């Protein structure tokens, strides 16, 4: 490499061509540092009052949808903390070739809804050599970066840890080579590493879900849902091949979510003679009335001898057995596309947590690399290499054919879903004797996507446990009228992919006029347990039934349980409710389209979403869409708030912003309605921007259930029967009353009295809501603080956030080419790899 002068960017300028705004002290020789010059003078001087940290983010390995939201959240949270943030372009190649560019607030604007990674990714052969890693260390030190966030798979994270462990020795070599001064080792003693797993395979230990896995599953379900219609028409058998390498999560999740007949995954190879077992299972389905068959093959599927099982082999075997079989290999369609709500959410939360880790940790803590993961809806930190080594051990276990251990290493959720699939696909029934107990399911409240998959799992798992299954039509009103039918195995065939509610739902609840009719119906059908799957009205209904136990002794012999099935996520005993994920995906789809229309004409949109008195949908859609403001009842709306927000939008549009987005919950305020807010902003901003209002309405309740709503409703039903079995074993009869739901990554039971105390009847929501702090988080990372007159979100060294970090005009920026120019347009965010 030729000797050239380059710039260490210390925040005083971002021009790579040596213009006058660059601090000349930051010029160094690429091959040699002047020993008399202190490279770190600015940093050492500032340590006495406020050390300015410098951090970088890179994406490596295969891309996944959700990487961009993670980059956005990390970069902006770092800026709010007072640090300087850089992007390493093209993965580890960028470290080796010094393709490290500074980011400002506008650099990551508008990327939250984009798939892939705007900073590029690559697999680097040079980085695998020690010489390549030495160049990477030099380039990091040259830019005074000693905190690195790596977003990628286990290989990328292993590479980051290797760089960390070699850091000191590589610095010593650079000093010996004369490229760095000795005092550099004193000021850069360690390289701090944080990792976020970006992988569609969901193959990493230490997190419930990896960034990109939910979007990939969505792509698979969209394809399979489309294929099923043609398969049913022609009575065909389809073999679907999905990605996954050594991990069968995508095949397993899509198998559970679509009601597939058979899956082949590397973690649990089928027994010898599996071909005939598969054919027999497909034949049983056809004899039961199914018009199509579905086999899902993970690309890494093997048999017990370690021999690969290909989709072509499966298809040929089925054809030999007389099936009209077809293959669909989904390929890279699984990897791309707009991120789902969940991928945007977890990526945003993990990006913020990574920034907090670099700032909140002690020196000793920073010496140990961490993996930022998710447990339920919250972030967790785990030892990076412990998670990587555990993950990589799975490949060895598969190679050694220790298959009994593989599923256990994958984790409890993987094992649970595999057992659920085996039961629901009729591959292995318990064949237990009938318990002679009737279990009834009904819906109450508004319709929610996920109700039909729930009923399917409820029915099949219940039959598998030996219960007699019943379905009640039209909620508690239907129960009073005796509208009950027994549910059989094939009654719910195909329900896993259906939106709406086949059993029907309404908002009626038990009362003095119908309670005796309800009890008569329960006695006539010999019901021992009631599961209400629905919304807040349903919880009021089961609370009312529980109250009637004092007057009607018959109810004391019946278990009454509520399960969350509402888009509003406003019921007690759970962090999330089934249906809210589908609703948020519908909302984000609409918001993305609205934002595209707004860009063309400098427009501010005021969008109203459902949720009644609960602001969950508004808060979450704001966090994951990049909306500047969200208005919810829990925080209230005042005239002062609206005035400050109006000032903020005026300032933003004055600075050539082309779009603004406000999301309002439908009952956020009785006085300041959606139309009032629209009228106010339209009148005051008419010379700068146009304003439109949009009420999304019932599109939020419809649509095919999302992957998460399908598989989590199934998981919820599996735990419901575990609770029933434990209750039966402990007391000899069913007597549990309360609700079940998702709390802290698990499924928990809440007793009835505790559930009732948690409910706010006035506002029809839980008294305590876990997500409230995220409203402020969303606002903080969406609006440049110097644009926001109400901003109080500066921390620590916030004085370092200046006008230089503000989005600037397009004419001031040059566009990049790979490994060359070190700046890019921070306003329009071009795909760097194009």
Swiss-Prot record:
Subunit and interaction comment? Homotetramer.
One molecular function GO term is: fructose-6-phosphate binding
Q: Compositional bias (Polar residues) spans?
A: 813-834
Q: Which gene encodes it?
A: pfkA
Q: What is this protein called?
A: ATP-dependent 6-phosphofructokinase
Cofactor(s) named in the record: Mg(2+)
Task: Give the region (Disordered) as residue ranges.
Answer: 799-834
Positions with a binding annotation for substrate? 199-201, 236, 243-245, 299, 326, 332-335
Q: Which organism is it from?
A: Dictyostelium discoideum (Social amoeba)
Under Pfam families, the record lists: PFK
Q: Taking the first listed entry, what is the main subcellular location of this protein, grouped into a coarse class? A: cytoplasm
**Database matches in HAMAP family:** Phosphofructokinase_I_E
């Amino acid at each position: 490499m030729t000797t050239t002068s380059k710039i260490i960017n210390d925040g005083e300028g971002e021009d790579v061509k040596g213009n006058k705004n660059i601090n000349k002290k930051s010029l160094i020789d690429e091959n040699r540092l002047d020993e008399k010059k202190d490279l770190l003078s600015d940093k050492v001087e500032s340590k006495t009052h406020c050390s300015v940290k410098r951090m970088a983010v890179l994406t490596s390995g295969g891309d996944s949808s959700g990487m961009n939201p993670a980059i956005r959240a990390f970069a902006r949270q770092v800026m709010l903390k007072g640090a300087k943030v850089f992007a390493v372009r093209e993965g580890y190649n960028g470290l080796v070739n010094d393709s490290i560019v500074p980011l400002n607030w506008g650099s990551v604007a508008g990327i939250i809804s984009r798939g892939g990674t705007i900073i590029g990714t690559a697999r680097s052969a040079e980085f695998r050599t020690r010489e390549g890693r030495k160049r990477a260390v030099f380039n990091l030190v040259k830019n005074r970066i000693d905190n690195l966030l790596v977003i990628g798979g286990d290989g990328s994270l292993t590479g980051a840890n290797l760089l960390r462990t070699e850091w000191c020795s590589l610095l010593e070599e650079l000093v010996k080579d004369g490229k760095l001064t000795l005092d550099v080792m004193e000021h850069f003693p360690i390289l701090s590493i944080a990792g976020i797993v970006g992988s569609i395979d969901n193959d990493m230990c230490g997190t419930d879900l990896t960034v990109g896995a939910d979007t990939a599953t969505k792509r698979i379900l969209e394809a399979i849902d489309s294929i099923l219609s043609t398969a049913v028409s022609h009575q065909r058998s389809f073999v679907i091949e999905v990605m996954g390498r050594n991990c069968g999560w995508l095949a397993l999740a899509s198998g559970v979510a679509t009601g597939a007949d058979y899956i082949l995954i590397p973690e649990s190879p089928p027994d010898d003679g599996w071909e005939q077992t598969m054919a027999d299972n497909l034949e049983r389905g056809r004899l039961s009335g199914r018009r199509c068959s579905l086999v899902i093959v993970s690309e890494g599927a093997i048999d017990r001898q370690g021999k690969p099982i290909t989709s072509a082999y499966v298809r040929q075997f089925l054809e030999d057995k007389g099936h009209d079989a077809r293959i669909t290999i989904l390929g890279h369609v699984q990897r791309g596309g707009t991120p789902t709500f969940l991928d945007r959410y977890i990526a945003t939360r993990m990006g913020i947590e990574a920034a907090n880790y670099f700032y909140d940790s002690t020196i000793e803590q920073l010496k140990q690399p961490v993996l930022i993961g998710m447990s339920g809806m919250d972030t967790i930190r785990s030892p990076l290499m412990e998670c990587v080594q555990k993950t990589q051990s799975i490949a060895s276990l598969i190679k050694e054919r220790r298959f009994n251990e593989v599923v256990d290493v994958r984790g409890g959720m993987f094992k649970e879903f595999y057992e659920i699939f085996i039961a629901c696909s009729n591959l292995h029934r318990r064949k237990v004797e009938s318990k002679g107990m009737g279990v009834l399911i009904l819906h109450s409240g508004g319709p929610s996507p996920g109700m039909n998959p729930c009923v399917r799992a409820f029915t099949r798992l219940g039959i598998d446990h030996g219960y007699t299954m019943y379905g009640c039509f039209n909620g508690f009103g239907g129960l009073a009228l005796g509208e009950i039918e027994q549910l059989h195995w094939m009654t719910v065939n195909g329900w896993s992919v259906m939106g709406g509610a086949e059993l029907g739902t309404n908002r009626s609840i038990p009362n003095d006029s119908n309670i005796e009719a309800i009890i008569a119906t329960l006695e006539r059908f010999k019901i021992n347990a009631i599961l209400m799957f629905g919304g807040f009205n349903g919880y009021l209904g089961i609370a009312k039934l529980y109250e009637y136990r004092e007057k009607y002794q018959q109810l004391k012999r019946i278990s009454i349980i509520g399960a969350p099935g509402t888009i509003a996520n406003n019921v007690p005993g759970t962090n999330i409710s089934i249906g809210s994920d589908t609703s948020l995906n519908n909302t984000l789809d609409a918001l993305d389209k609205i934002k595209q229309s707004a860009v063309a004409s400098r427009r501010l949109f005021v969008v109203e979403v459902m949720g009644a008195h609960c602001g969950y949908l508004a808060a979450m859609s704001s966090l994951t869409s990049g909306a500047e403001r969200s208005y919810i009842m829990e925080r209230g709306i005042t005239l002062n708030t609206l005035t400050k927000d109006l000032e903020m939008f005026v300032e933003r549009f004055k600075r050539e912003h082309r779009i603004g987005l406000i999301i309002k919950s439908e009952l956020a305020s009785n006085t300041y309605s959606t139309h009032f807010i629209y009228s106010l902003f339209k009148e005051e901003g008419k010379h700068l921007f146009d304003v439109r209002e949009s009420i999304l309405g019932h599109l939020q309740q419809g649509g095919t259930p999302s992957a998460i709503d399908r598989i989590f409703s199934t998981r919820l039903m599996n735990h419901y029967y575990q609770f029933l079995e434990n209750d039966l074993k402990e007391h000899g009869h069913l007597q549990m009353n309360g609700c079940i739901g998702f709390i802290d990554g698990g499924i928990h039971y809440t007793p009835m009295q505790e559930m009732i105390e948690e409910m706010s009847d006035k506002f029809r929501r839980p008294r305590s809501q876990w997500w409230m702090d995220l409203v402020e988080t969303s606002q903080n990372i969406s609006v440049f603080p110097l644009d926001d007159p109400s901003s109080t979100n500066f921390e620590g060294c916030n004085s370092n956030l200046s006008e230089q970090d503000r989005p600037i005009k397009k004419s001031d920026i040059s566009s990049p080419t790979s490994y060359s120019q070190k700046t890019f347009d921070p306003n329009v965010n071009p795909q760097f790899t194009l």
